[in-house]
């Protein structure tokens, strides 16, 4: 075998995945479609280079161009979010959160985050995650009537438990979040406030959602999802003193060598996000989500949690269809619509089964879908879930999906 010879089975799988993406309507809220330039940066020769440390302070030689790349990513990120400090080295959103915890907390400290069935993330204190094992985690839920954040209840929980860190942000919440109310609660109990804006970072960057940067002590995010970049993480703050603690908590505290090829891809994505067209894109993402939510609300058997959406996603309660979230995910997969099962507030089913679906519009909007297309996708989903065993309905749905993906091909 020659050095560099492609492994046939591997490249067959990659080609098949490329075809799957082309042929599928992608509605997973955390997924998107990156530009060729982002992919090219991530596949560049930077993958060959070790660069422990930070720009100008490396443990290896030969980092002069690596320093330029990482500094560009930092500068673009700071400009994009109007932040004083940015660390672009976290390998993921989870690593970004872990780094902040390591910088601000000690094992056993109390943290307060959104519960999983309310829309929180594993790293916000789930008992099966490091965040719930290393720290004393307490959770807040949603108001059962409005299915929105209940700040008076959150305040009561904070006063009772005196957390050292309050975590705002979610992985499945469709409404605008009032960062200032979280700040007031944090100040009242003497806690740090961390915002995890992984899902809504693109909306924050364009002003479609209020920014947490001026309010929170520290903000974490992923760089994919609505930012349309490579899979990775980032930490932002306006507190430079805190930034120094975070830098050392990340390296050498949490990670070793940064993935500079991914950081290059982050820089390219941030550059794209700074262009006027990105604001137009995010505006369309929200319009598409709201169009889908409005269509779902016409259904007798599908209920939109909280009654609608202000961002890129929605949670739908499909209990009345008689189909579980797990079965709905598989059923929609069979007609080339990709979603993910999701717990609804107060769900009695396990997270592996669920009574709902999480649906997002970043990827279809990157393909050029507009409101009418989004409504049509919602109608297809409604018909499939109302007729899960009707083969004619499933065949028709698959044909409708093909028409939409042929109309809006991945560029």
UniProtKB/Swiss-Prot annotation:
The record's keywords, sorted A to Z, are:
Amino-acid biosynthesis, Cytoplasm, One-carbon metabolism, Pyridoxal phosphate, Transferase
Query: Which PROSITE patterns does this chain map to?
Result: SHMT
Compartments reported by the entry = Cytoplasm
Pathways involved: One-carbon metabolism; tetrahydrofolate interconversion; Amino-acid biosynthesis; glycine biosynthesis; glycine from L-serine: step 1/1
State its cofactor: pyridoxal 5'-phosphate
What's the EC number here?
2.1.2.1
Protein's GO biological process = glycine biosynthetic process from serine; tetrahydrofolate interconversion
Site for Plays an important role in substrate specificity, residues: 224
- The signal peptide stretch is none
The PTM N6-(pyridoxal phosphate)lysine maps to 225
Binding of (6S)-5,6,7,8-tetrahydrofolate occurs at: 120-122, 350-352
Its GO CC terms are:
cytosol
Q: Which GO terms describe its molecular function?
A: glycine hydroxymethyltransferase activity; pyridoxal phosphate binding
* Cystines in this chain: none
Q: Which reaction does it catalyse?
A: (6R)-5,10-methylene-5,6,7,8-tetrahydrofolate + glycine + H2O = (6S)-5,6,7,8-tetrahydrofolate + L-serine
Q: Organism's domain of life?
A: Bacteria
Looking up Pfam families in the UniProt record yields: SHMT
Q: Which NCBIfam families match?
A: PRK00011.1
Q: Which family does it belong to?
A: Belongs to the SHMT family.
Q: Which PANTHER family match?
A: SERINE HYDROXYMETHYLTRANSFERASE (PTHR11680), SERINE HYDROXYMETHYLTRANSFERASE 1 (PTHR11680:SF35)
The entry describes its oligomerization and partners as:
Homodimer.
Primary role: Catalyzes the reversible interconversion of serine and glycine with tetrahydrofolate (THF) serving as the one-carbon carrier. This reaction serves as the major source of one-carbon groups required for the biosynthesis of purines, thymidylate, methionine, and other important biomolecules. Also exhibits THF-independent aldolase activity toward beta-hydroxyamino acids, producing glycine and aldehydes, via a retro-aldol mechanism.
Protein's recorded name: Serine hydroxymethyltransferase
Look up and give the organism this protein is from. Lactobacillus gasseri (strain ATCC 33323 / DSM 20243 / BCRC 14619 / CIP 102991 / JCM 1131 / KCTC 3163 / NCIMB 11718 / NCTC 13722 / AM63)
């Amino acid at each position: 075998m020659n050095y560099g010879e492609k492994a046939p089975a591997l490249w067959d799988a990659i080609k098949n995945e490329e075809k799957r993406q082309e042929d599928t309507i992608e509605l997973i809220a955390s997924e998107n479609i990156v530009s060729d330039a982002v992919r090219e940066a991530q596949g560049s020769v930077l993958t060959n280079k070790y660069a422990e440390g930070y720009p100008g302070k490396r443990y290896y030689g030969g980092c002069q161009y690596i320093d330029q790349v990482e500094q560009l990513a930092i500068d673009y990120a700071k400009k994009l979010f109007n932040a004083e400090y940015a660390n672009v080295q976290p390998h993921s959103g989870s690593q970004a959160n872990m780094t902040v915890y390591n910088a601000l907390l000690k094992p056993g400290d109390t943290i307060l985050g959104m519960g999983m069935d309310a829309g929180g993330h594993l790293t916000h204190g789930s008992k099966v995650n490091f965040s719930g094992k290393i720290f004393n985690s307490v959770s807040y839920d949603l108001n059962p009537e409005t299915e929105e954040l209940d700040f008076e209840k959150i305040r009561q929980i904070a006063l009772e438990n005196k957390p050292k860190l309050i975590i705002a942000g979610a992985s499945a919440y469709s409404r605008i979040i009032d960062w200032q109310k979280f700040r007031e609660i944090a100040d009242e109990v003497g806690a740090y406030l961390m915002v995890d804006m992984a899902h809504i970072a693109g909306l924050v960057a364009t002003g479609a959602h209020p920014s947490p940067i001026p309010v929170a002590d520290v903000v974490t995010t992923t760089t994919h999802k609505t930012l349309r970049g490579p899979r990775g993480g980032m930490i932002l703050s306006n507190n430079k003193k805190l930034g120094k603690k975070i830098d050392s908590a990340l390296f050498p505290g949490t990670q070793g060598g940064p993935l500079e090829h991914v950081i290059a891809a982050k820089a390219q994505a941030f550059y794209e996000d700074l262009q006027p067209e990105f604001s137009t894109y995010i505006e369309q993402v929200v319009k598409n989500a709201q169009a889908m939510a409005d269509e779902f609300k016409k259904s007798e058997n599908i209920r939109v949690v909280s009654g609608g959406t202000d961002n890129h996603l929605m949670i739908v309660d499909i209990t009345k269809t008689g189909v579980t979230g797990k079965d709905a995910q598989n059923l929609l997969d069979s007609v080339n619509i990709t979603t993910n099962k999701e717990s609804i507030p107060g769900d009695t089913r396990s997270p592996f089964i669920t009574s709902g679906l999480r649906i997002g519009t970043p990827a279809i909007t990157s393909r050029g879908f507009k409101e009418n297309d989004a409504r049509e996708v919602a109608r297809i989903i409604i018909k499939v879930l109302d007729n899960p065993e009707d083969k004619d309905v499933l065949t028709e749905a698959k044909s409708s999906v093909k028409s939409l993906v042929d109309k809006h091909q991945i560029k």
